């Protein structure tokens, strides 16, 4: 890996010396609503504002050099292009999404680095992850599947914080992240991206149009990620970062049809071999109690598509199927799990005057089986979970006048155990003029919990899992208020986007880490839980070579039970993002990006020597990029510039099987092995270098 890093470095120097820089070009777009002409030096911003206005999907006045847009809908939804995430290039979607204010990828284990995505402080189980609008990533697949979504297959990501459309159902309590994959018709004929770093990791992306004619196009892409370097900077005899060897193959077909009817389908296969644990662990130690290691093999297959029926009315069929198998050991604890999900949805859409009507029917069938008590009946016999959910929805987006738009939605789902589930949605957009937009949305949520797929702590064996009672479904009331202001300054403007959010939970299922140090006790909360807060984003939109984007979020997430208020774990009250970009005249650009977090409550044991709250910290990155006119692009930089590393993420790493817990002399406080304290990556300052190349 070091040799590859040196070769890439020399290659970039040679190309820089031989290829002449290109004069800066610009892309001029007219915004009629503001009567402003603006120029962008970003080559990636190829879609004209006129085209976007015709589609009526994008609020064009929010376009800037960060390639961030807002959907022109009563529901506040931000759209982030691939160019936005290239400001800090990463290997997968899980790491990339940290650049979005109010969205936090949370590492839940200091050993294997499983994680979930928090929106506005709510745990990852409350975030609905969609691919091309379909719930392909759920339950078991969220444990390690998020790191298996390579950025190379992503065209853009749509983020909705708070109540989303009734189309998405009742489980999207915290918000929705919709990953839109690349369109084979519009993709380059060939593209590749190779990135490596000084710690030995390598990420390879290759994409090629294998078919391209007047009727259809097919895009075949390969992503390979490898990290095999055992690093232990904090000297606790555990790997700081898990070793990973994964591959993802993606194939998408897009068809050209009469009257621009939609038709596409895609397939993806994903495999990963992941290990984290003691430095001396080897494959022969897998599943034994000789040396502690967490070894996970993941196999996953996805098939999904869209087909618009050849009818006068607009009927759109969405379909997907995914198979996910996990073969894992956490120390000597085996976890074997299989999940199969079938999803079908027929959508109807029609414009009647000022009303955009939508309706549809849905079937989501989930099969889940594992070797834990979660799929055992009262007699202790294996009983896989089979949960078909049938539903339908109605939605009316009513443009009352030029200033007011009202969205009314309702969804009904039938669950075989919990029966009828009703999910109303209301959203209102008020735009008195092009400079001010107010959005208000409200909805309810309903969610059934699977502890063994949603909470990694239930699997590690570091604590005994206790389920206190029959768990009831969680219910919530959610509301979101958004205000977008565009401040004109001569021929430019500044965007200010402020969002307030509030969620109230009944029957919230919580894990009690505090009552007994060797147990996690799960039960429905007798009281209630609340997530509330406010966030603000400020970004520039001008022709100057410097661009700024800054976001900050304040939130208060807690549960209240019998008069006691307990702050939620891993939910900092203050957090934010920053992005400073500068475009030089000779096709050089630099990006300073990062996130900052305030103190967050952490799972500690009684008399724990570690602080109950994390310190303030920031993860800062810097990148330098050089573009050439022949399709080459070279980039490199430094991650975690301030070298922040959490202290003591693992408790008693020298006794991972708790063989000496009862030794009062060496363990007077009764500490047990625990991996849940980690709150940030263990990788310190490090460098990266990459090369991109594409042929249109």
Predicted features along the sequence, with ranges:
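Short, acidic, small-residue-rich periplasmic hinge/interaction motif at the N-terminus
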Residues: 19-86, 124
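Short acidic/polar hinge/loop motifs at secondary-structure boundaries
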Residues: 118, 134-161, 249, 468
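N-terminal periplasmic accessory domains that precede
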Residues: 60, 93-96, 115-118, 130, ...
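Gram-negative outer-membrane beta-barrel transporters
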Residues: 399-403, 501-504, 524-604, 692
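Extracytoplasmic beta-strand/coil segments of soluble accessory domains associated
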Residues: 94-135
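C-terminal beta-signal and adjacent terminal beta-strands/loops
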Residues: 548, 596-601, 626-696
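Flexible loop and strand-edge segments within Gram-negative outer membrane beta-barrel domains
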Residues: 19, 227-248, 256-315, 321-340, ...
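Membrane-embedded beta-barrel scaffold of Gram-negative outer-membrane proteins
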Residues: 314-328, 431, 439, 472-524, ...
């Amino acid at each position: 890996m070091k040799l590859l890093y040196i070769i890439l470095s020399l290659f970039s120097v040679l190309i820089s010396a031989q290829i002449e820089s290109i004069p800066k070009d610009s892309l001029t777009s007219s915004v009629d609503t503001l009567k402003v002409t603006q120029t962008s030096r970003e080559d990636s911003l190829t879609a004209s504002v006129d085209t976007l206005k015709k589609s009526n999907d994008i609020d064009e006045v929010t376009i800037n050099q960060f390639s961030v847009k807002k959907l022109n809908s009563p529901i506040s939804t931000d759209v982030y292009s691939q160019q936005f995430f290239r400001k800090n290039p990463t290997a997968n979607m899980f790491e990339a999404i940290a650049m979005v204010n109010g969205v936090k990828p949370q590492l839940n284990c200091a050993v294997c680095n499983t994680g979930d995505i928090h929106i506005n402080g709510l745990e990852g189980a409350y975030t609905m992850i969609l691919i091309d609008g379909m719930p392909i990533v759920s339950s078991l697949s969220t444990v390690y599947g998020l790191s298996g979504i390579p950025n190379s297959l992503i065209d853009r990501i749509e983020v909705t914080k708070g109540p989303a459309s009734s189309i998405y159902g009742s489980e999207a309590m915290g918000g929705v992240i919709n990953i839109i994959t690349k369109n084979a018709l519009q993709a380059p004929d060939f593209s590749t991206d190779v990135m490596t770093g000084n710690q030995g990791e390598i990420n390879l992306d290759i994409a090629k149009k294998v078919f391209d004619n007047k009727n259809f196009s097919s895009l075949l892409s390969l992503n390979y990620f490898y990290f095999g370097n055992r690093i232990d900077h904090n000297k606790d005899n555990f790997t700081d970062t898990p070793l990973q060897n994964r591959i993802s193959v993606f194939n998408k077909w897009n068809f050209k049809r009469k009257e621009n009817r939609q038709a596409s389908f895609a397939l993806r296969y994903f495999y990963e071999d992941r290990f984290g644990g003691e430095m001396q662990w080897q494959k022969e130690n897998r599943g034994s109690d000789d040396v502690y290691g967490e070894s996970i093999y993941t196999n996953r297959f996805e098939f999904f598509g869209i087909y618009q029926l050849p009818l006068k009315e607009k009927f759109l069929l969405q379909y997907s199927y995914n198979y996910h198998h996990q073969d894992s050991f956490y120390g000597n604890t085996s976890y074997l799990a299989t999940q199969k999900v079938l999803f079908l949805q027929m959508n109807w859409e029609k414009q009647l005057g000022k009303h955009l009507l939508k309706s549809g029917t849905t079937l989501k069938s989930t099969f889940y089986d594992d070797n834990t008590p979660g799929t055992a009946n009262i007699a202790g016999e294996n009983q896989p979970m089979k949960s078909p959910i049938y539903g339908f929805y109605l939605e009316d987006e009513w443009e009352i006048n030029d200033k007011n738009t009202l969205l009314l939605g309702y969804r009904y789902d039938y669950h075989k155990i919990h029966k009828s589930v009703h999910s109303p949605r209301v959203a209102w957009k008020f735009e008195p003029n092009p400079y001010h937009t107010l959005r208000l949305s409200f909805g309810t949520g309903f969610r059934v919990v699977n502890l063994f797929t949603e909470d990694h702590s239930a699997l590690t064996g570091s604590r005994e899992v206790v389920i206190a009672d029959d768990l009831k479904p969680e219910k919530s009331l959610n509301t979101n208020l958004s205000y977008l202001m565009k401040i004109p300054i001569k021929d430019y403007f500044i965007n200010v986007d402020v969002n307030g959010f509030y969620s109230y939970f009944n029957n919230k299922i919580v894990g009690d880490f505090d009552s007994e140090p060797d147990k996690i006790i799960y039960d429905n909360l007798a009281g209630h839980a609340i997530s509330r807060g406010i966030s603000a984003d400020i970004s520039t939109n001008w022709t100057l070579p410097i661009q700024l984007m800054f976001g900050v979020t304040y939130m208060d997430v807690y549960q209240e039970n019998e008069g006691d208020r307990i702050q939620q774990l891993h939910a900092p009250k203050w957090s934010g993002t920053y992005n400073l970009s500068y475009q030089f005249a000779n096709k050089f650009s630099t990006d300073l990006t990062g996130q900052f977090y305030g103190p967050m409550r952490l799972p500690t044991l009684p008399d724990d020597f570690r602080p109950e709250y994390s310190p303030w910290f920031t993860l800062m990155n810097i990148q330098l990029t050089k573009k050439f006119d022949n399709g080459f692009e070279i980039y490199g930089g430094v991650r975690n510039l301030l070298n922040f590393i959490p202290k003591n993420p693992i408790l008693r790493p020298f006794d991972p099987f708790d063989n000496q817990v009862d030794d009062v002399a060496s363990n007077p406080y009764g500490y047990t092995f625990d991996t849940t304290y980690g709150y940030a990556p263990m990788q310190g300052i490090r460098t990266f270098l990459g090369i991109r190349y594409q042929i249109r």
